[in-house]
């Protein structure tokens, strides 16, 4: 039947109709292909969106993981920078100290040093003030002031004196010898001077230049004095320990004797009297003598007379 319909259609249709029919069929096919392409594009877009979403999620996870790492890294960087800054400051300080030491050593090598001695220091004068006074005459390298003894300090404070530190004597080293000589000549036996009304204006210093004396000699002397002081302290401590040990031994002995007496008192008076006045017995010999005027009862008889008497008694 279909074949017949087609044949009939072919008989009554013209060429133009057939061409239009073919075009319509082709357009339907083309439309169907466009729909397919659109659906494919939509699917591609959805897949791309899904992939983009997945990538964004992954990136967010990575960022979440990397954020604490970055924070830790920043903290570590800050700590490293702080340590570096502290080390740099310490290095700068050490370098400055080295430069100062080198400069002082260079000055000492160029010039011969001189040492002056102060037999008395004005009351309550500090080393900083003394250095300020001495720098008028030249550059001062080292300064040493000796404090008073602890015993003197305690007595002074106990008597109502000032509680400030007091120095008895001192030494100062000038980088140039001529400055030390000038200081000794000008300050010895004279007032310190300066502005009127200052605390140390009218104090007199006794300064002496020590020829041929170096700072090493002073350090040796101080070390020797410290050794002597330490030896005296050790001797005093050993004597005190001996006295303490003897005192403890005497106390223990007295306690022991007291305990013995108490035990005897508890035992009774008889036992106490017997123990306190013991009765001793001694073997007594007969008194004999060979003197002619001695009484007959104590007169010593000779051995011959004794034998004769025995013989006569036997015979009778």
Curated annotation (Swiss-Prot):
Residues 114-204 form the RRM domain. Residues 290-316 have a biased composition (Polar residues). It comes from Saccharomyces cerevisiae (strain ATCC 204508 / S288c). One of its GO terms (molecular function) is RNA binding. Signal peptide: none annotated. Residues 32-44, 59-78, 268-289 have a biased composition (Basic and acidic residues). The modification Phosphoserine is found at residues 7, 13-14. GO terms for cellular component: cytoplasm; nucleolus; small-subunit processome. The keyword Phosphoprotein applies. The gene is ESF2. Gene3D superfamilies: 3.30.70.330. Residues 1-91, 261-316 are annotated as: Disordered. Belongs to the ESF2/ABP1 family. One of its GO terms (biological process) is small-subunit processome assembly. It is found in: Nucleus, Nucleolus. Component of the 90S pre-ribosomes. Interacts directly with DBP8. The lineage of its organism: Eukaryota, Fungi, Dikarya, Ascomycota, Saccharomycotina. This is Pre-rRNA-processing protein ESF2.
